[in-house]
Amino acid sequence: MNKIKLGFAVCGSFCTFSKIKEEIKKLSKSDIYDIYPIFSEYAYSTDTRFCKSSDFVSEIEEICKRKSIKSIKEAEPIGPKKMLDILAVAPCTGNTLSKLSAGITDTSVTMAVKAHLRNGRPVVIGVSTNYALGTSASNIGCLLSRKNIYFVPMRQDDCIGKPRSLVCDFSKIGETLNFALKNEQIQPIFI
């Protein structure tokens, strides 16, 4: 049986990287997916208090057993070559949400999404932004209405300290992928 070709795009919500690494490990061990790692330019090159970028990238590439896509030039062939069956963007930052909503293609991740969507194939978004219920709310609403866009269930992660913040339930990425491959949105979206 052929494995499902999964693009896994990582944006710069650095505090979630340890959770993302665990989910990529689970998906890799499931033996269902052949995973293509994709990094935003910031996720690929920015060292933070959470991790050194080169270490994180190396770990993900080792799990996926392939080099990452990390530039617009490298992401563009995803469409014409029909490289992927499904594409996940997790964590998806507010900045990336706004660009996807507006059709701006100026990063490796936004190019990967644009190139993939041209083939009418599913994109799964795992939100992680402090402004989801503020400036990013309209972008989430816009993307919810778009064909072939699906969301990982999300919740307020700190309703007192960060009342506008939403983070997806990363443990539901696999389940969301299964639904999206059937052109269905997992429910509920807000948990």
Regions found by a protein language model. Give the residues of each.
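A cross-family phosphate/adenosyl-ligand binding-site feature
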Residues: 1-123, 128-191
